[in-house]
């Protein structure tokens, strides 16, 4: 499958409040721009795939957020898992500026997209990858749902609204 470079409705997806068990949720939502800024500047992304027997497999990957899509490369067990079960969760490393994407990973087969990803990888990670000799395939994650929240860890108390700006976005 070839990924689209734009996700319909991705520039301004609908937002709502998620259920946050055991915490107080305030009234303000985060903007989608807040999410895209963090995804764009992240160096490492964590992905969670599912093995054939149903166990989850979590690992860090390097990637690029571009045009509403998370692109990453992997030649590991994650690639095998995605071949059989393309459902994926991806998130950033921070526990205080949380961004979580849920969606489907698609193998990137369009040569022009692969070459663009290699160019962006080389720039971002100071590599010298050759698009004809990649260690593994590239995937594109199309979010179906996203979550985000932020807080200052030093300000969290049992009475605080630690997840006061928790927001959920849904995509068409």
Language-model-detected regions and their locations in the chain:
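Alpha-helix N-cap/helix-start capping motif
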Residues: 75-76, 111
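Short beta-strand segments
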Residues: 42-75, 82, 86-93, 100-102
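Intrinsic disorder/low-complexity segments enriched in polar/charged and small flexible residues
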Residues: 34-36, 48, 64-67, 129, ...
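Charged, gly/pro-rich active-site loop segments
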Residues: 1-29, 97-172
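Short, basic/aromatic recognition patches
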Residues: 19-46
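Short secondary-structure boundary/capping segments
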Residues: 36-37, 62, 80, 91, ...
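A generic alpha-helix structural signal
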Residues: 36-39, 83, 117-122
């Amino acid at each position: 499958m070839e990924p689209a470079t734009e996700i319909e409705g991705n520039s301004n997806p609908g937002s709502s409040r998620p259920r946050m068990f055991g915490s107080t949720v305030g009234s303000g939502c985060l903007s989608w721009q807040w999410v895209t800024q963090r995804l764009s500047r992240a160096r490492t992304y964590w992905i969670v795939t599912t093995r054939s027997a149903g166990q989850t497999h979590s690992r860090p990957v390097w990637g690029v957020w571009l045009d509403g899509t998370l692109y990453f490369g992997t030649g590991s067990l994650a690639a095998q898992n995605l071949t059989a079960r393309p459902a994926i969760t991806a998130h950033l490393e921070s526990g205080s500026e949380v961004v979580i994407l849920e969606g489907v990973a698609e193998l990137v087969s369009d040569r022009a997209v692969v070459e663009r990803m290699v160019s962006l990888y080389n720039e971002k990670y100071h590599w010298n990858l050759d698009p004809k000799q990649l260690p593994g395939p590239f995937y594109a994650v199309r979010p179906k749902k996203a979550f985000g929240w932020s807080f200052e860890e030093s300000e969290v108390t049992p009475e605080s609204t630690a997840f006061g700006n928790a927001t959920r976005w849904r995509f068409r």
